[in-house]
Amino acid sequence: MVALFKSSLGRPEQHQTPQIRISPASSNVEHSEKQPRRDFRVKKYVAPGFSQLNWSKLVASGQNLSGVEKPIPVTKEELAKHKTKEDCWIAIRGKVYNVSAYLPYHPAGQKRILDYAGRDATVIFMKFHAWVNEEALLKTSFVGFLV
């Protein structure tokens, strides 16, 4: 059986991989070579020590990152006051989170969150992170309910 795979010189034969070409006419795939695809989900590099694993460890530590002792009712007016890098609150599905500590951990960069600081970010969050459990991700950052 080994002889089948050896050439007359005793070396393994070099096999050529056949080149298969699919013409656009025989394919249902549309090609858009003229315009490059704009990918809004571009990941940025985070600083060492600020990976999602590091964030998970911080959350698991139980440290209160919300800035409040216990959950409070938050009005839209109060939410709007917290829109800086040092004091960044967002609302997702009726819950308000202080995401100031999370900013350097966000894979797409801080600006993506800061663009929605002080506002209800449910729609944009669901557009890009529908599969993410924000309650678990931000449980130690929970400020209260949006009223």
Curated annotation (Swiss-Prot):
<dbReference type="InterPro" id="IPR001199">
    <property type="entry name" value="Cyt_B5-like_heme/steroid-bd"/>
</dbReference>
<dbReference type="GO" id="GO:0005737">
    <property type="term" value="C:cytoplasm"/>
</dbReference>
<feature type="compositionally biased region" description="Polar residues">
    <location>
        <begin position="15"/>
        <end position="29"/>
    </location>
</feature>
<keyword id="KW-0349">Heme</keyword>
<dbReference type="GO" id="GO:0005634">
    <property type="term" value="C:nucleus"/>
</dbReference>
<keyword id="KW-0408">Iron</keyword>
<dbReference type="InterPro" id="IPR018506">
    <property type="entry name" value="Cyt_B5_heme-BS"/>
</dbReference>
<feature type="binding site" description="axial binding residue">
    <location>
        <position position="129"/>
    </location>
    <ligand>
        <name>heme</name>
    </ligand>
</feature>
<feature type="domain" description="Cytochrome b5 heme-binding">
    <location>
        <begin position="71"/>
        <end position="147"/>
    </location>
</feature>
<dbReference type="InterPro" id="IPR036400">
    <property type="entry name" value="Cyt_B5-like_heme/steroid_sf"/>
</dbReference>
<protein>
    <recommendedName>
        <fullName>Uncharacterized protein C1F12.10c</fullName>
    </recommendedName>
</protein>
<dbReference type="GO" id="GO:0046872">
    <property type="term" value="F:metal ion binding"/>
</dbReference>
<dbReference type="GO" id="GO:0020037">
    <property type="term" value="F:heme binding"/>
</dbReference>
<dbReference type="GO" id="GO:0004128">
    <property type="term" value="F:cytochrome-b5 reductase activity, acting on NAD(P)H"/>
</dbReference>
<comment type="similarity">
    <text>Belongs to the cytochrome b5 family.</text>
</comment>
<feature type="region of interest" description="Disordered">
    <location>
        <begin position="1"/>
        <end position="37"/>
    </location>
</feature>
<feature type="binding site" description="axial binding residue">
    <location>
        <position position="106"/>
    </location>
    <ligand>
        <name>heme</name>
    </ligand>
</feature>
<keyword id="KW-0479">Metal-binding</keyword>
<dbReference type="InterPro" id="IPR051872">
    <property type="entry name" value="Cytochrome_b5/Flavoprotein_Rdt"/>
</dbReference>
<dbReference type="GO" id="GO:0005829">
    <property type="term" value="C:cytosol"/>
</dbReference>
<dbReference type="Pfam" id="PF00173">
    <property type="entry name" value="Cyt-b5"/>
</dbReference>
